[in-house]
Amino acid sequence: MAVNHYENFPVASLLLPARLRPAVRALYAFARGADDIADEGNAGNEERIAGLDYYAAQLDKIERGETPEPEQFRILQQVITQYRLPTTPLYQLLSAFKQDVVQKRYEHYDQLFDYCNRSANPVGQLILHLYDAATPENLRDSNAICSALQLINFWQDVALDWEKQRIYVPLDDMRQFGVTEQHINHQQYDAAWQALMAFELQRTRELMLSGSQLALRLPGRIGLELRSVIQGGLRILEKIELVQGNVFQHRPVLSKWDWVVIGWRIVRM
């Protein structure tokens, strides 16, 4: 289960109504393309920022009612017009991707949470708008779920992010538990690291559960899709706990048995 950036889009899910799949694919293409500019290949920071600025310029054209240049953006324009989607979430995604280019550490949890607000929450907001279900209550709970999914991805990918010289664990949390960057560099799995991970996992679980009622309010396929996402995220948290936070040697993935467990829990929600 991957829950980073654009992969929060349920692009291939059979639970999506056929009528919405083209729209979701267009949104996915935008997010995937922008994320790749920020994170893939060997381009320098200036080139990455320029690429993201180009995406923003195409959004600006859509905002002004002009026709953007590449076909990808013309398709996106049609989706935005058809479903009366706000463009603010798309700009927020670009802002987060730019931040990924230049920022590798987060001093406080609030800073990380703000990043999640722009890197993950726009996904849920756009999906709710597609379903014409973007009420204040639904948006609040969706934001909690999407931020939790993003945080889960950070905790399971500590070692992978270190390869890109990124640490998403808040530095003041690390200091509180006596953990340093050398713990990650040397994959040092000790009592301090275990305590830090236990703290982050519990906080993330509480955040996820705070938004879980959304899955029960939304009807039909979207509710079932969301219950699957929530239970999948919670299962990943459990698997990290089972190895006492040792994500260095045991990066958690969902097995067939895990999906059986998830299916049972979906029924019981």
Spans of features found by a protein language model:
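Catalytic cores of Mg2+-dependent Asp-rich isoprenoid enzymes
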Residues: 1-150, 155, 159-269
